[in-house]
C-alpha cells in the first residue's frame, strides 16, 4: 500500500493499515513490564523530539500503538518516521 509516497509493506511491514487507511497499528510484546516501559520511555522521548505523539496503551508486557496525523486526518511521513523508530526501539529493548 502506498501512502504519502511510502510503500508501507516495504518500509514498515509489521504495521497494519486501518480499514479506512488513515492510521497504522501494531502491538509490541516484550518479556515483561520493565521492557515495555523502557520501550515506551524511548518512544516518548523521540516523539517529543519530532513533536508527533502516538495513541497507545500498555497492559503489562504489551504496548498497543496507533499512529495517525490528527491535524491532516490521514497518514503522513511523520507516522512512518515514528513507526520506523518504534520498530528500532523494540528491537533494541528486546535484545537486552
Model-derived features with residue positions:
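Charge-rich alpha-helical segments
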Residues: 1-96
Amino acid at each position: 500500500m502506498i501512502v504519502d509516497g511510502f510503500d508501507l509493506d516495504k518500509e514498515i511491514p509489521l504495521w497494519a493499515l486501518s480499514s479506512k487507511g488513515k492510521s497504522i497499528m501494531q502491538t509490541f510484546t516484550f518479556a515483561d513490564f520493565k521492557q515495555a516501559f523502557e520501550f515506551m520511555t524511548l518512544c516518548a522521548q523521540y516523539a517529543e523530539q519530532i513533536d508527533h505523539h502516538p495513541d497507545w496503551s500498555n497492559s503489562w508486557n504489551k504496548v498497543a500503538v496507533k499512529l495517525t496525523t490528527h491535524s491532516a486526518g490521514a497518514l503522513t511521513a511523520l507516522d512512518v518516521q515514528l513507526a520506523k523508530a518504534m520498530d528500532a526501539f523494540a528491537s533494541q529493548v528486546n535484545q537486552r
